[in-house]
Structures are given as structure tokens and as C-alpha cells.
A protein has these predicted regions:
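Domain-level signal for Mg2+-assisted phosphodiester chemistry and nucleotide/NA-binding surfaces
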Residues: 1-93
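Extended two-metal-dependent nuclease catalytic cores across DNA- and RNA-processing enzymes
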Residues: 27-28, 52-54, 78-218
Length: 218
């Protein structure tokens, strides 16, 4: 099994600790952050090794630039004022040095992971690659995902049909975390009903196109 780790969220969360006093910043020092990151990664790999024989681990983190922001100025604009952990860049550098993490330019980390997943599954087969991430966007791929979130710690085995549905559902629902919502008021219930007879990409595209045409009257 080839394990692809999207480490962005893990690096971010490794910067934080529980506040011990009201004056506490809530951030780890760099050495504690490294230890936390290493500990969680080892736990993830050990968990996967219970079910699969791990042949290779590839880490992805710290993408620079994003073509989506050139298309839409509102993309992730809701995160502009978010405080960035002061040791974030240093921890990213550590992961790059210690784990030889792959870094995307002009794209996001999940774009790079998806590209690697596609190429590797073409070569070794879909059941020989697993993505490690808490990001729901990967459910748009017919892949095996390990969600390491402490409340979940579970596998998702996404079928072709599920991946297709998830892809077109997100075209309508958008993603509030990324400040993407072009069809306000249309959620899961709408998609479930609108897509109930859809099988092909053409079926889905007709539904999505009709809705956008209705909303934007173009």
C-alpha cells in the first residue's frame, strides 16, 4: 500500500497546545510541535499497518500560490484575518526536511495529492493507494481514505458513483470553509432530490447548469 499524507491540517494542529493560563499563547514551541507531529504521524501509520502492508509513505504540505484566487477574489477571503501560528513556516520546513514532503506551486496540496493518486492508481491499481486526510474534498475521488480526526479515525471506501455524486453536489453546495457558495439556499436535501435519476456526467451537468441558469438568469 502506498500512503499519501495530506499534512497541511496536521502541521497546523501540531502548532497548538491546550492553554495552561489565560496569558498562555496556546502555541507549542517548535520542538514540542515537532514531537506532536511525529507522534501523530507514527500513530496514523501504525493504525494503517494493522489493515494493510505499507510499502511507501509520501507526504504533501505547504503549497504556495493558488490559481483559484486569480479566478475569484472571494475564494478563502474569510480566512484573511485568521491568526497564523508563529511557528507554522518553521514546522513546514521541518516536515519538508525530515519527510521530504512534496510541495505544490500555483495549486493546493489536495490538487497535488489528487494528481499523485491518479498517476499511482493508473500504475498500481486503485486498491494499492490510500489518502490520509480529514478533508472531505477527497471524497470526490473513487479512493480509499483514512480520516485521522480524533473523533473519527476511520476508513472511507468511496465508489465511482459516490465520487461522482459528491463532485456535483459540491458544485451546488460549495464549501463554506473556502467561502464558496454560489447557490445559496440549496443544500443536501435539494441535491438528493435533484440528482435522484442522475447516472452519467451528462445527467448531472444538466441539473447543475439548469440551477445556475435559474439563479443567475443568463
Amino acid at each position: 500500500m502506498i500512503v499519501l499524507i495530506d499534512a497541511d491540517s496536521l502541521i497546523w494542529s501540531s502548532c497548538y497546545k491546550q492553554k495552561e493560563t489565560p496569558e498562555d499563547s496556546g502555541y507549542h514551541n517548535i520542538e514540542d510541535a515537532k514531537d506532536k507531529y511525529n507522534e501523530v504521524v507514527m500513530k496514523i501509520i501504525n493504525t494503517i499497518e494493522v489493515d494493510y502492508e505499507v510499502d511507501k509513505v509520501i507526504t504533501f504540505a505547504g503549497a504556495r500560490g493558488n490559481f483559484r484566487k486569480q479566478i475569484s477574489k472571494t475564494y478563502k477571503a474569510n480566512r484573511i484575518d485568521r491568526e497564523v501560528p508563529p511557528i507554522l513556516n518553521e514546522l513546514q520546513d521541518y516536515v519538508k526536511e525530515q519527510y521530504q514532503s512534496k510541495q505544490g506551486y500555483g495549486i493546493e496540496t489536495d490538487d497535488l495529492v489528487a494528481t499523485y493518486w491518479t498517476n499511482l492508481t493508473d500504475t498500481f491499481g486503485r486498491d494499492e493507494v490510500i489518502i490520509v486526510s480529514i478533508d472531505k474534498d477527497y471524497k470526490q475521488l473513487p479512493c480509499i481514505i483514512y480520516d485521522y480526526h480524533y473523533k473519527k479515525q476511520c476508513y472511507h471506501n468511496i465508489t465511482e458513483a459516490e465520487a461522482k455524486y459528491n463532485f456535483y453536489e459540491q458544485m451546488i453546495m460549495g464549501d463554506t470553509a473556502d467561502n464558496v457558495n454560489f447557490c445559496k439556499g440549496y443544500g443536501k436535501a435539494y441535491c438528493k432530490n435533484a440528482f435522484k435519476d442522475c447516472l452519467s456526467d451528462y445527467n448531472y451537468i444538466r441539473v447543475v447548469f439548469s440551477l445556475f441558469k435559474k439563479i443567475y438568469k443568463q
